[in-house]
Curated annotation (Swiss-Prot):
UniProt KW keywords: Activator, Cytoplasm, Nucleus, Transcription, Transcription regulation
Record text on subunit structure and interactions: Interacts with POU2F3 (via the POU domain) in a DNA-dependent manner; this interaction recruits POU2AF2 to chromatin and increases POU2F3 transactivation activity.
Assigned protein family: Belongs to the POU2AF family.
Any Pfam family the entry gives: POU2AF2
Job description of the protein: Transcriptional coactivator of POU2F3. This complex drives the development of tuft cells, a rare chemosensory cells that coordinate immune and neural functions within mucosal epithelial tissues.
Record-level GO cellular component terms: cytosol; nucleus
Full protein name: POU domain class 2-associating factor 2
GO MF entries: POU domain binding; sequence-specific DNA binding; transcription coactivator activity
UniProt-annotated location(s): Cytoplasm, Cytosol; Nucleus
UniProt note: domains: In the N-terminus, possesses a conserved OCA domain for bivalent binding to class II POU domain-containing transcription factors and to an octamer DNA motif (5'-ATGAAAT-3').
Major subcellular location class: cytoplasm
Residue ranges annotated for the OCA domain, each copy included: 10-32
Biased composition (Low complexity): 35-48
Protein's organism: Homo sapiens
């Protein structure tokens, strides 16, 4: 029983809405027909179907009411008038548009050359690009690819001047160690062990000095510094040979340090990737 009133109410609502609109349109159509017959008499009988014919009967009745006054009274006159307007306007706007286009083109030619931005923008940008992106100011900012160049040591000295004196002490030692690289190592191993580990060691030293992020390692290194050999007589090559003797000198190790020493025992990954991490940690400990 509940579904019947719902369907009934929906049907009644739709029916009322549709009938209302259709009734309004029919009433407007009838009123338009009666007004045409009253205003124009016999003329409305011949022209009212012409006005109300285009479109569907619903829309024709809706639009016929509003257009009936103008179309019935001025229909024949608007034909001749529209022809006069079109014929007179066909000859006029074309010369006006052409003259306007020529005048604008003549006025805007000195302001807009044929290639507006290609003539002067690139020469204005090329010296800026040359001054910003040329190779002359960048070498003091970026390290050279090979650590044997003297500019690399100058860059690292200028980088380490901001650190405390205790951290800037092993700079000449690392320079000597990099100068005494064996010729058997390839350029890739020189790059990885020299430049990357060097920057890691300096960044670790700065983080230890500033934020004390590795406080446990710092305390352990302070306790175990007498067990380490002195830095000056140890370049890069003796460190590879002494790496097997390193764990008994260190003493008790944390899990992180055991992972580092485990990478030290294997000589093959030392040349590849783990060597840079182990060398950076060793250099960071050597700062104390």
């Amino acid at each position: 029983m509940e579904s019947v009133p719902g369907d009934y109410s929906k049907r009644v609502y739709q029916g009322v809405r549709v009938k209302h609109t259709v009734k309004d349109l029919l009433a407007e159509k009838r009123s338009g027909q009666t007004s045409n017959s009253r205003l124009n008499g016999s003329v409305s009988s011949s022209q009212s179907p012409f006005v109300q014919m285009p479109g569907s009967p619903v829309t024709s009745g809706y639009y016929g009411v509003r257009r009936s006054f103008l179309s019935d009274s001025d229909f024949h006159n608007s034909k001749q008038f529209s022809n006069d307007v079109y014929t007179s306007s066909v000859g006029k706007p074309f010369p006006c548009e052409s003259s306007a286009g020529q005048s604008h083109a003549a006025l805007l030619e000195p302001y807009f050359p044929q290639e507006p931005y290609g003539d002067y923008r690139p020469p204005a940008l090329t010296p800026n690009a040359g001054s910003l992106f040329s190779a002359s100011p960048l070498p003091p900012l970026l390290p050279p690819p090979f650590p044997g160049d003297p500019a690399h040591f100058l860059f690292r000295d200028s980088w380490e001047q901001t650190l405390p004196d205790g951290l800037s002490q092993p700079d000449p030692v690392s320079a000597d160690a990099l100068l005494t690289l064996p010729p058997s190592t390839s350029c890739l191993s020189q790059l990885e062990s020299g430049s990357i580990a060097q920057h890691r060691g300096s960044s670790w030293g700065s983080s230890l000095a500033g934020a004390q992020s590795y406080s446990l390692h710092a305390l352990e290194d302070l306790h175990h510094t007498p067990g380490y050999p002195t830095p000056p007589p140890y370049p890069f090559t003796p460190f590879m040979t002494v790496s097997n003797d390193l764990p008994p000198k260190v003493g008790p190790l944390s899990p992180d340090e055991e992972a580092d020493t485990g990478s030290l025992h294997d000589p093959s990954p030392w040349v590849k990737e783990d060597g840079s991490i182990a060398w950076g940690s060793y250099e960071c400990r050597r700062a104390y």
